[in-house]
């Protein structure tokens, strides 16, 4: 049996994520597919912010305790550092497993007791070289084949969505955010903006 998985921060979930998952689940019917949400969040520097912190402010918003963080697997407390309810909702229509790990090494260790012919990692074409280098650095490149997943919508990314929040571009924000999440994101948009404004004052 072949195993396929994808890993990402999903910060936040976009219609691009859902499109890619939809396409690949239908393409790889009758096999095991795993969606892995990366649960590693770096700690922010409270004394002096950097442009990188502003660009990835969701991570620092989480690590500063603005949003409650609990690290656990989906079958345990079912919590994600961003929002476990969003995770469950987004993948509720798919016959796949959702789990939380720190990195790709932990991902493959989860499957060590599962018999499979080959382990495949699906990613966007913009992440292909990056993931290959990471796997080589972790000495697990021989255990995983990295493939470009199909179904990704051009021009839609978490980066674009985060930039829309920073620019207070609510129209773009609503056009990219995964539809099931919209009802929760009015407060989130305000919270995110307040934090990025706070970071800018520290630069």
Language-model region placement:
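Nucleotidyltransferase catalytic core that binds NTPs
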Residues: 1-203
């Amino acid at each position: 049996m072949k195993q396929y998985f994808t890993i990402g921060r999903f910060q936040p979930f976009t219609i691009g994520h859902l499109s890619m998952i939809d396409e690949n689940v239908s393409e790889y019917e009758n096999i095991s597919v795993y969606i892995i949400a990366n649960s590693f969040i770096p700690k922010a520097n409270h004394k002096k912010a950097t442009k990188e912190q502003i660009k990835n402010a969701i991570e620092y918003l989480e690590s500063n305790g603005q949003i409650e963080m609990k690290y656990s697997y989906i079958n345990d407390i079912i919590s994600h550092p961003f929002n476990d309810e969003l995770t469950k909702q987004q993948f509720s229509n798919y016959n796949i497993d959702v789990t939380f790990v720190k990195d790709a090494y932990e991902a493959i260790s989860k499957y060590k007791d599962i018999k499979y012919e080959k382990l495949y990692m699906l990613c966007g074409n913009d992440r292909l070289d990056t993931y290959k280098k990471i796997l080589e650095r972790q000495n697990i490149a021989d255990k995983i084949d990295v493939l470009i997943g199909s179904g990704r919508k051009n021009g839609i990314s978490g980066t674009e969505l985060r930039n829309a929040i920073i620019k207070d571009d609510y129209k773009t924000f609503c056009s990219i955010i995964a539809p099931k999440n919209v009802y929760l994101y009015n407060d989130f948009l305000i919270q995110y903006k307040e934090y990025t404004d706070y970071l800018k004052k520290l630069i």
